[in-house]
From Swiss-Prot:
Region (Disordered): 1-44
HAMAP family in the record: Ribosomal_uL15
Bias (Basic and acidic residues): 1-11
Source species of the chain: Brucella canis (strain ATCC 23365 / NCTC 10854 / RM-666)
Family: Belongs to the universal ribosomal protein uL15 family.
Compositional bias ranges of the Gly residues kind: 21-35
PROSITE patterns from the UniProt entry: RIBOSOMAL_L15
GO BP annotations, alphabetical order: translation
Gene3D superfamilies tied to this protein: 3.100.10.10
Transmembrane segments: none
Name of the protein in its database record: Large ribosomal subunit protein uL15
Molecular-function GO terms, alphabetical: rRNA binding; structural constituent of ribosome
Keywords: Ribonucleoprotein, Ribosomal protein, RNA-binding, rRNA-binding
Length: 156
């Protein structure tokens, strides 16, 4: 059997029914839409309109707000950092920070800083200078013999 011999099973793929193409086709004239009215016409449905019933977006109350001072961090796991070190993309002897992670291709776009999470294992002794880290990540870094420098009140 060759790739060019492969065929779909008969009846498994139905041809698309073209509507509104003459009465002989069975779906000509009104094309399965019935007769007249808003639903028979094209492009006239009103988004969110529920036929006069109070729409869901007005029945439910407004909630929350967008904090314009919120910081967005690049989240990186210890496993990804170890993989970059093993691949030779990241130097374990140099300080690991936002710039070095970006240069190594671990993160794509730099945001307000890097936050390290404890997923995976860290075997290398690494010095970090980052915006945040989880408690478990700090423990794993110190257990591996590394150090971590965080801004005040960033370790949570």
């Amino acid at each position: 059997m060759k790739l060019n011999d492969l065929r779909d099973k008969p009846g498994s793929v139905k041809a698309r029914k073209r509507v509104g193409r003459g009465i002989g086709s069975g779906t000509g004239k009104t094309g399965g839409r019935g007769v007249k009215g808003q639903k028979s016409r094209s492009g006239v449905s009103i988004n969110g309109f529920e036929g006069g019933q109070m729409p869901i977006y007005r029945r439910l109350p407004k909630r929350g707000f967008t904090n314009i001072f919120a910081k967005s961090f690049n989240v990186v796991s210890l496993g990804r950092i170890q993989a970059a070190i093993d691949a030779g993309k990241l130097d374990a002897k140099a300080v690991v920070n936002l710039d070095s992670l970006k240069a190594a291709g671990v993160i794509r776009r730099a945001k307000d800083g890097v936050r390290i999470l404890s997923d995976g294992e860290l075997k290398a002794k690494v010095a970090f200078e980052v915006a945040g880290a989880s408690k478990a990540a700090v423990e794993k870094i110190e257990k591996a013999g590394g150090s971590i420098k965080l801004p005040e009140a960033a370790a949570e």
